Regions:
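Bacterial Sec-dependent N-terminal signal peptides
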Residues: 1-29
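Membrane-proximal, proline-rich intrinsically disordered regions
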Residues: 20-72, 108, 116, 122-125, ...
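Structured, solvent-exposed acidic/aromatic patches
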Residues: 34-41, 80-141, 145-423, 427, ...
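Amphipathic alpha-helical surface "interface" segments used
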Residues: 71-72, 137, 204-218, 338-348, ...
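C-terminal functional modules
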Residues: 420-533
């Protein structure tokens, strides 16, 4: 974490004026040409864009490329890369930027903006008592951001984080227990979701809100859906907590269709660093996308049990896969788009390994399937959370008897249907019709083709394509699908799939509180608090 070192020159300057008249000091502190009150509507929009950039306001691809793609997508075997350091999740190697990116950018950009909104709409702030819906929407954004930090690292600074301007005692915030953070975040979601109301004054909220355009009903649904996610994350370690908050989420009202999906719209400009989709930009061939392919694990799953026919194929096969194609900065050139011929790259292999497997010198671009380029346009929207996840979590809750949820089969089938039919946000041609979903469900009957919880876990895994942050967390908690770890000689985990990120070296060296509260041992195979699988 970057600390407020810039405060120290200001403090030293203050010592030079200790003998001055207090009124003179007051006048000196006012710059008539400065903006002393920030526009909270602008800050809120910036915070929402920051959610899509995972905290990085200066380079929207930075965190996605290093962590969402480089670690998460490869560790859960959605993607594969025969190279080295740009994809540490493939061979379980170390990349310091991968570790640092979510931590540093979430605190320094994302949470900083949210903290300003909460401070200025609280007692003593310049907008105290106003912008109630924006304030509570910011509490939901804050819960989303901290949930991810806890899920990635374990214990993190929470209760006193982002308070450096309140005094020097907050310059090095202490670490808080993951379970305590989760409990407080669930409380925050409960209070914030309940407090939002369409009857409250708009006060610029609708214009500032680029996710739901001020639709309070959708904000409430997202708040309760996020509550459901977090409650189920805690279900293996705190059954009472999970039961309480699953009940609250259902009673409050979760997402009920793909129209409720939390999506940040993106655009080609004015800034490629802020307005464009960071995932798409990270995959551009010049930025590292060229040697990245769909994993054999994912392609084999999408092709069903019988690879000789398309009868039991997942209807998302040729939605997620754009085929075997040569992709350069100049053009996307399809080579083979036949579903039967789609082929994923095995994880944990380098070029020599691939040559040995194929029995010939491998031209990767002409051998392995790529992500559909229609999902990687610079102005494609950025999915934050979707309705499919909600239905699949309700299916799991019903299957396990948590929170009064019922009818697991109906929730499961609704979740699969929603997952198959949500890709039209990228291109209208990617929507799967009902007949294809019906055929897939008939070929894979709930609780019959495989054990029910395994089917739920596998569907959560595949439904989070592109949202690999959450797919990694779902896999760590549920344990499905059963993934075979890689064991490349360069790996650092002894052939174990990483289960957390290490803290940034800047935090280890720069925050004295790290030594007495962080999750230890600080390595890739330590489990976060809810991970029992």
């Amino acid at each position: 974490m970057k600390y407020l070192y810039k405060l120290f020159p200001a403090l030293m300057l203050g010592l030079l004026f200790t003998s001055c008249d207090s009124e003179e000091l007051h006048d000196l502190n006012i710059n008539p040409q400065a903006v002393n009150e920030m526009n909270l509507n602008f800050i809120f929009t910036t915070a929402e864009l920051g959610i899509a950039a995972n905290g990085s306001s200066g380079d929207n691809r930075y965190t996605d490329w290093r962590t969402n793609i480089g670690m998460c997508a490869h560790a859960i075997q959605h993607l594969a890369n025969a190279g080295g350091g740009i994809a540490p999740g493939d061979k379980y190697t170390e990349n310091f930027e991968t570790n640092a990116a979510p931590f540093e950018f979430t605190y320094n950009d994302q949470l900083k903006n949210i903290a300003e909104i909460l401070k200025q709409t609280a007692d003593g702030g310049y907008d105290a008592g106003n912008k109630a819906n924006m304030r509570n929407a910011s509490r939901i954004l804050r819960a989303f951001s901290f949930q991810r930090l806890v899920d990635f690292y374990g214990n993190v600074p929470y209760f006193n984080a982002n308070r450096g301007l309140d005094g020097s005692e907050y310059f090095f915030p202490e670490y808080d227990e993951s379970s305590a953070i989760y409990k407080d975040l669930l409380k925050e979601l409960d209070e914030a979701s309940a407090a939002m109301s369409a009857s409250l004054p708009d006060e610029g909220f609708a214009a500032a809100d680029i996710i739901f355009n001020g639709d309070v009903a959708k904000w409430k649904k997202w708040g309760y859906s996020l509550m459901l996610r977090m409650a189920m994350r805690a279900s293996d370690v705190d059954a009472a907590l999970a039961n309480t908050y699953v009940q609250k989420a259902i009673a409050g009202g979760v997402m009920t269709s793909n129209a409720d999906n939390a999506i940040v719209p993106m655009a080609l400009g004015p800034s490629e660093w802020t307005n464009q989709n960071g995932i798409s930009r990270a995959f551009f061939p010049g930025d590292g996308g060229q040697p990245t392919f769909l994993s054999k694990t994912l392609i084999d799953y999408l092709k069903g049990a019988d690879h000789a026919t398309v009868a039991d194929d997942d209807p998302r096969l040729m939605v997620i896969s754009g085929g075997i194609a040569d992709w350069t900065a100049a053009a996307w050139t399809p080579i083979n788009t036949n579903p039967l011929d789609q082929k994923g790259m095995p994880n944990g292999k380098d070029q020599q390994d691939l040559d040995a497997i194929e029995g010939t010198a491998v031209d990767q671009a002409k051998t392995y399937s790529r992500i559909n380029y229609l999902m990687l346009q610079d102005d494609d929207p950025y999915m934050i959370m979707n309705y499919a996840e909600v239905e699949l979590l309700l299916a799991e809750a019903a299957e396990r008897g948590i929170g009064g949820a019922s009818n697991a089969k109906s929730h499961f089938e609704a979740g699969v249907r929603a997952a198959c039919q949500m890709y039209n946000i990228y291109d209208a041609s990617l929507k799967v019709d009902n007949a294809a979903v019906d055929a897939y469900l008939a070929a894979n009957p709930y609780g019959t083709a495989k054990p029910a919880l395994q089917m739920i876990g596998e569907q959560l895994w595949v439904s989070k394509f592109l949202n690999w942050w959450e797919a990694w967390s779902d896999w760590r908690r549920i344990g499905y699908p059963v993934l075979v770890p890689t064991n490349h000689p360069s790996g650092l985990t002894g052939g174990k799939i990483p289960t957390r990120l290490k803290y940034p070296t800047s935090e280890v060296a720069g925050n004295p509180s790290y030594k007495s509260g962080s999750t230890q041992p600080d390595d890739y195979t330590t489990r976060v608090w809810w991970d029992t699988k």
